[in-house]
């Protein structure tokens, strides 16, 4: 009879691996000056319960509340979870976030994002790492300087279409979030390609593009959530959606490539793609970069507008105060509305946008993966303030949504929507820096943040000029609102409002 059965060999092997990993981990901690992580949450055996808890919370529209609750109940701002036995560091500590996104930027990567997003977005600024990303950044940064994103008058034709859709629903409840996503798709495609898809016109082709772009993004989010098993989220429909979006982009690229530089120079308006052609004539590069920017250009602004309007419709005094400011600065004039005045003469408008981005950041959570054995400044030791070990390949998830409700920075009413806090001296004097990151931070900070803020400012200003009363449909929402978290965040149930009392045309 054999002394060592296959089962016994397997047990011996597992024990040997465990002992070796334990010793190696202790060696790395000693070498790098790290302490054991202070707080560990185990959801069942090896964390097998966590993925199911996350899935349940997500299906209920409560993933963000689930995540924030974990941080609020934790004694420290950084802790470790296990999911299927894999250790994952979670943090809302601004110092750790700054380390990953800036101070130790070169030590962390996007992990498998390229593989997960490539079917739709190709090799662009949001999918690439290292030298390819640096090249993209250098190429794209000049396209988002103030002079390129400050022409607010270009938004008015699209606002007229938005207003037409709203007027058709006067005194009826309707989902304005759907209109905001169409509006930002129209403005983003015009800014990028020089031609809008005009989804607010309800044309068959434009709605097909809208559906394809939206559903493809949802599948990309699933691929990201599957981590190494991303390839399981695939299929004919996914590829059809990608092809429809890419074909539109490619047609726009081909049109511009057939133009000479002299023809492009004669244009009296700025379009992203037309300027990019002066830098490169590689059709693949042009298509991929445009699609990468389109994703952010549509979703970030639509999310901001939707959550802002939800709160404005829920809080009539805030809406009245906004209208008072807008009418004082601009009266009912279109000509008076400029980029500079929106930024400098409308502090309450800007406070509303800041507060919306604080409570409802478009990208509420993100992650980085260590490229080498390294440390993060906080999370270890008795008080959780000592460095912790981050092994090569280990994921670190950071939750901006949890950082943004930290009472240390935003006082005890941090969970309440209160724009006035941004006009009060205590918050003005604070150096929020890495505790307020609606557009990420460090070298990968969002290039289009001024584009998004300008567009949102203009739309809210025009709505305040045009309408005196807005209200949410009773029993159509919960508070806090249910959230859908894909690549960006939106309201799961939409924003069903009634807008009445037209002020001006």
Swiss-Prot record:
Membrane topology summary: Single-pass membrane protein
GO MF annotation list: heme binding; iron ion binding; oxidoreductase activity, acting on paired donors, with incorporation or reduction of molecular oxygen, reduced flavin or flavoprotein as one donor, and incorporation of one atom of oxygen
SUPFAM superfamilies in UniProt: Cytochrome P450
Chain segments annotated as coiled-coil in the UniProt record: none
Disulfide bond entries: none
Origin species: Candida maltosa (Yeast)
Induction: By N-alkanes.
EC number: 1.14.14.-
Family recorded in the similarity comment: Belongs to the cytochrome P450 family.
Lineage, top ranks: Eukaryota, Fungi, Dikarya, Ascomycota, Saccharomycotina
Domain of life: Eukaryota
Compartments where located: Membrane
Gene symbol of the encoding locus: CYP52D1
CDD domains linked to this entry: CYP52
Enzyme class, UniProt record, top EC level: oxidoreductase
UniProt name for this protein: Cytochrome P450 52D1
Main location: membrane
Cofactors named for this entry: heme
Function: Together with an NADPH cytochrome P450 the enzyme system catalyzes the terminal hydroxylation as the first step in the assimilation of alkanes and fatty acids.
């Amino acid at each position: 009879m054999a002394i060592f059965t296959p089962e016994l060999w397997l047990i011996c092997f597992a024990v040997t691996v465990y002992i070796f990993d334990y010793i190696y981990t202790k060696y790395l901690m000693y070498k790098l000056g790290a302490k054991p992580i202070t707080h560990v949450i185990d959801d069942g055996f090896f964390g097998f319960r966590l993925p199911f808890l996350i899935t349940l919370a997500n299906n209920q529209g409560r993933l963000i509340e689930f995540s924030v609750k974990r941080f609020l109940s934790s004694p420290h701002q950084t802790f470790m979870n296990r999911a299927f036995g894999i250790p994952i560091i979670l943090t809302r500590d601004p110092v750790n976030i700054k380390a990953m996104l800036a101070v130790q930027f070169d030590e962390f990567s996007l992990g498998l994002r390229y593989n997960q997003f490539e079917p739709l977005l190709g090799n662009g600024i949001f999918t690439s790492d290292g030298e390819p990303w640096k090249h993209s950044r250098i190429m794209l940064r000049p396209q988002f300087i103030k002079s390129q994103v400050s022409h607010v008058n270009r938004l008015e034709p699209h606002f007229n279409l938005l207003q037409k859709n709203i007027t058709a629903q006067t005194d009826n409840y309707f989902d304005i979030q759907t209109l905001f996503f169409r509006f930002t798709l129209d403005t983003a495609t015009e800014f990028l390609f020089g031609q809008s898809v005009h989804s607010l016109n309800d044309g068959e082709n434009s709605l097909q593009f809208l559906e394809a772009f939206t559903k493809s993004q949802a599948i990309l989010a699933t691929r990201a959530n599957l981590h190494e098993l991303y390839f399981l989220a695939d299929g004919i429909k996914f590829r059809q959606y990608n092809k429809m979006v890419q074909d539109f982009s490619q047609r726009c690229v081909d049109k511009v490539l057939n133009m000479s530089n002299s023809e492009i120079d004669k244009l009296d308006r700025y379009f992203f793609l037309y300027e990019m052609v002066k830098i490169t004539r590689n059709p693949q590069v042009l298509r991929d970069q445009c699609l990468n920017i389109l994703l952010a250009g549509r979703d970030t602004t639509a999310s901001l507008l939707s959550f802002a309007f939800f709160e404005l419709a829920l809080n009539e005094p805030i809406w009245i105060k906004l209208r008072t400011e807008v009418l004082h600065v601009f009266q009912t004039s279109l000509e008076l509305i400029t980029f500079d005045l929106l930024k400098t003469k409308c502090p309450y408008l800007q406070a509303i946008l800041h507060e919306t981005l604080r409570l409802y950041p478009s990208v509420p959570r993100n992650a980085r993966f260590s490229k080498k054995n390294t440390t993060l400044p906080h999370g270890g030791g008795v008080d959780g303030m000592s460095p912790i070990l981050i092994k090569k390949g280990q994921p670190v998830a950071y939750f901006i949504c949890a950082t943004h409700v930290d009472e240390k920075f935003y006082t005890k009413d941090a969970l309440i929507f209160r724009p006035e806090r941004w006009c009060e001296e205590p918050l003005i004097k604070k150096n929020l820096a890495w505790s307020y990151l609606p557009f990420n931070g460090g070298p990968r900070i969002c290039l289009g943040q001024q584009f998004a803020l300008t567009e949102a400012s203009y739309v809210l200003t025009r709505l305040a000029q045009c309408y005196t009363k807005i209200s949410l449909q009773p029993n159509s929402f919960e508070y806090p609102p249910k959230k859908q978290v894909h690549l960006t965040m939106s309201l799961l149930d939409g924003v069903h409002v009634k807008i009445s009392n037209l002020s001006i045309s």
